[in-house]
Amino acid sequence: MGRYSVEPDNATKSCKARGSNLRVHFKNTRETAQAIKHMALRRAQRYLKNVIAKKEIVPFRRFNGGVGRKAQAKAFGCTQGRWPKKSAEFLWQLLRNAESNADYKGLDVDRLVIDHIQVNRAPKMRRRTYRAHGRINPYMSSPCHIEVILSEKEQVVAAPSPEEDAPKKKQSKKKMARQKLMQRD
């Protein structure tokens, strides 16, 4: 079992999944992972399916050199975006694996949220391409490691209404003394 970069706050209410040396572009996968961070599991799976179908876009914020501008990116408050199909498929499979782990642990799958997702660079894989005049250039790939931690969302407790438990207004010592005098009279 591999080591994770963070440990969940509540290990009994969370589950993990990871993939190592995945042959998918690091930069595209990092942007896709940032897009689904802190999403509910069901929403993230739906989002990734929409990315594969080009119905929703992945905003490119860090690795955005040469990335074209798209109208769909306005929903995320930026202008540049793409639909990295392979990255979305790899992340979707990883989320499915984490969902199976949660189901095995007996967690409520509908209340799961992506608490932590991280994409790291893996060692580059080397190939070669043949150029003019007998030269050879490197033809590298940039694989990545992905880890995800899902946690059960806490139940939201309704706040008490203001009529039931209204906080008393603070009074100055002078005003309290005046009220005591009035009560004595």
Swiss-Prot record:
GO terms for biological process: cytoplasmic translation. NCBIfam families: PRK04223.1, uL22_arch_euk. It comes from the Eukaryota. Pfam families: Ribosomal_L22 (PF00237). Keywords: Ribonucleoprotein, Ribosomal protein. CDD domains: Ribosomal_L22. This is Large ribosomal subunit protein uL22. Residues 169-178 have a biased composition (Basic residues). InterPro entries: Ribosomal_uL22, Ribosomal_uL22_CS, Ribosomal_uL22_euk/arc, Ribosomal_uL22_sf. Belongs to the universal ribosomal protein uL22 family. One of its GO terms (molecular function) is structural constituent of ribosome. One of its GO terms (cellular component) is cytosolic large ribosomal subunit.
